[in-house]
Amino acid sequence: MAAVTFASAITNAITSKPALTGMVQFGSFPPMPLRSTTVTTVATSVAQPKLYTVQFGSLDPVVVKSGAGSLAKATRQQPNVEIDVSLSEAAALEVAKPRSNAVLRMHEEANKERALFLDWEASLKRSSYGIAEDEKVVMTTHGVSKIVPRSSRAMKLKRARERRRAQQPIILKWEPKLSGISIGGGLSASVIEAEEVRTKWPLHKTPSMKKRTVHRICKMNDQGVDMLTRSLVKIFKTKSANIEYIGKKSIKVDFIRKERTKFARIQVAHLLGKRAQRDLLTGMEENHFIDILSKYSGNKTTINPGVVCAGWSGIVVGNGILTQKRSRSPSEAFVIRGEHEGKLYDARIKVTRTMSHKIVHFSAAGANFWKGFDRCFLAYRSDNREHTCYSGLDVTECGEVAALMCLAMFPCGKITCPDCVTDSELSQGQASGPSMKHRLTQLRDVIKSSYPRFKHAVQILDRYEQSLSSANENYQDFAEIQSISDGVEKAAFPHVNKLNAILIKGATVTGEEFSQATKHLLEIARYLKNRTENIEKGSLKSFRNKISQKAHINPTLMCDNQLDRNGNFIWGERGYHAKRFFSNYFEIIDPKKGYTQYETRAVPNGSRKLAIGKLIVPTNFEVLREQMKGEPVEPYPVTVECVSKLQGDFVHACCCVTTESGDPVLSEIKMPTKHHLVIGNSGDPKYIDLPEIEENKMYIAKEGYCYINIFLAMLVNVKESQAKEFTKVVRDKLVGELGKWPTLLDVATACYFLKVFYPDVANAELPRMLVDHKTKIIHVVDSYGSLSTGYHVLKTNTVEQLIKFTRCNLESSLKHYRVGGTEWEDTHGSSNIDNPQWCIKRLIKGVYKPKQLKEDMLANPFLPLYALLSPGVILAFYNSGSLEYLMNHYIRVDSNVAVLLVVLKSLAKKVSTSQSVLAQLQIIERSLPELIEAKANVNGPDDAATRACNRFMGMLLHMAEPNWELADGGYTILRDHSISILEKKLSTNLGRSMERVKLVGALCYKILLVKASNLYTERFANEKRSRFRRQIQRVSHVILRTE
């Protein structure tokens, strides 16, 4: 096949002209005419010759000249021509081709592709003339074209488009088509190629291959719906259930019995209390449903005139069974509404507004009234009845009395009349005050005379009449109180004014106003009470104990001879002799092991947290501020325990500090320091360097010896020449007397003792002291501060002020507080000491162990008094010999305790003469005054054990005094069964103790006999051993035999 291609001349205008025709001669072959074709060319001002090239196989090409150039050349000369346009404008000249030569066809296709690629390469290389790639032409507002640079975003989008275009596959127009023939039943080449180039969908966009099951929609025709409706109506009628038909309108249906037949009743508007022109709104669907309903409402028996009456409203009947004159009906059924002039009206038809008021509706008003009455009566009647209710009063009389009560409480002409309700709201007409009082009197007399069995109704009316008559008419005093208290905002005058306004209202006062009046009266009473207390001497309400904000002046710390060049205190020889304190009563802190083990300061019945852990300071300010927060304890108000009085006046130096308003000053967090003695309780504290005993050693007082810090602070004011003697006196004499956790009174006495020998310590400043009223502890704060906050602050600042606690006539609870606690409290706990049952068990353990009991009595000399709870314990205490042992001991040690034990011994002898437990308890109760008098002479410390014993004896005395009066009057006292149970329990405990004593005794005897037998056999001849062994066995049998 021969192909001739050409390119038409390129012009600036598009024209159409007939293709050139001519003759083409190939070698010696005869010339052949060219096929005439119509060619569309682009006209241009430049005329170029056309060349036609024809080649067959390997023969030389034949060039045919014409008036146009080649297509490639024309394309290169005109860069603005699009590839697609040049391709569309190319013309092909066909000549006669031999169809069997496939090689010629391949050359023809290759030339076409070569020309196409040349044109495409030229188009990609060309660029716009005069405008850069990153510029564009815009038109200004004045109509002038302007070249401006493209924005970075536009360039970015352009480059993206070019990248996408370059990535698209090149699809040639003359590409060979793939075969669609399938070989061997497999996929064809075109299908395989399409699958390879097909874009894969994302997984979430891949269509599901699951075959969905399409359910058939159940449809029912009108006949089926009617059949279903009839079946449902039958079922509901049988069960007397309610039906609600919901279409365009809602219809509610229930079933009632009339004339011994069950009818369907529709809820119409007038049954809900609404009077409308159309009593029931329905459409075609609703009317069709009502027609179906009418076939199952009632039966086919005709209903004669007069039968339809009140209570038939909304009932559905068929038109054929009504013989009375009736209105039209929108369907075959008839819904009864009411009657007017003997004519029945259907509820579905519309009547005039006038007629809607004239119609006598057939609603059962009385039935509705009793229905509402029964519902509310049953719902709101009280359940706190102590009897079973039955019908004992006449029902007619009950209804009459209920009507009279209704008229008395709610005077009206008709209970459904809204005008009567308005009169009652406005208190006018028949509901006015005088009218109601007159009516109440009449109705009360009627009930008294005609219904004598209803006395409760008369009482209710009497109370009601009294409430209406309770009017306050004392306007003169009301006006005077108003003139005195009005405008005065001081003290209780506003409460007086409000109370006066409430009292003048009389019977119209509400319960809430009565409650407010009581509150106002309470404020007035409080004002009078406070005013009376303020007048009294030594009242807590007037107690104010503000701390001085000025620091106490200590001359010792201001003397230049006592300070170094940095202003620090010089201990001198005092520092050397202070070793006696640090070596005996302080322990060394090892910072390498951390401060956690020292953070909690254990005291009896509680603990206090030190701030020693805050010595590690973080560099983060936020964390540092968090560290400056303390841990508050339970707050305690100002009570009698916070103050000290002398002849009725407050001793402020021996009291807790308060604010100006009288509230207690609560301690704040005390931050720690190293190697310092902190003194000063008022103003800013003073920090004194500790003596250099060992370099970089940190000391903390041992548990129970925190009061040593007081003596260390006193050492600052002691002369250096007296320091050795001072420290020896404290160590050898005072600390031995005080021991662990002494009372504040004992510490103050020790300070007075030191003041006698060393007067300079009188003005020595004390460390900070905090008061814990809950555990009755005085905390002496050292340089490690206190993380626990919320304690009261003791105002005592100097040794001289602390000595004031030693005054014998000082009334103070603080002087009995422990600077820690007692050993007895520490060992057993205050909760056990306060429990009489625990104390008597402790006494039972010592009944057969007199030495242990003697040790317990050293801490608590009143322990034997708990034997008064049980006659059996007293007898065992006497019979065991422990009482006699203690008497012999205390005759030499404390005669007052010996007298108390003698009284107990005489009581035990009296108890032993009686056989019954009740008689023995009466003997114990009669001896209580004598025991209390003997106890009062015992001089014991005012600690928890003493206070617990005082409460115990007071309890016994208060229980016994009423019994004495009854016995003196000749009455028999019936004891509770619990006394015998308690006695049996205590006797069991005594028996166990006795069994343990017997077992120990038996073991001791046996060991003694075995040792005697061994000793005899070692010293005597063999022939005498057997005889002696038999004697030992007989003695052992006699001694160890069980009874």
Curated annotation (Swiss-Prot):
Residues 698-820 form the Peptidase C6 domain. The record marks 362-363, 820-821 as: Cleavage. Keywords: Host cell junction, Host-virus interaction, Hydrolase, Inhibition of host innate immune response by virus, Protease, Serine protease, Suppressor of RNA silencing, Transport, Viral immunoevasion, Viral movement protein. Residues 219-362 form the Peptidase S30 domain. Gene3D superfamilies: Helper component proteinase (3.90.70.150). GO terms for molecular function: cysteine-type endopeptidase activity; serine-type peptidase activity. It is an enzyme of class 3 (hydrolase). The active site is at residues 270, 279, 313, 706, 779. A motif (Involved in virions binding and aphid transmission) lies at residues 672-674. Belongs to the potyviridae P3N-PIPO polyprotein family. This is P3N-PIPO polyprotein. It comes from Turnip mosaic virus (strain Japanese) (TuMV).
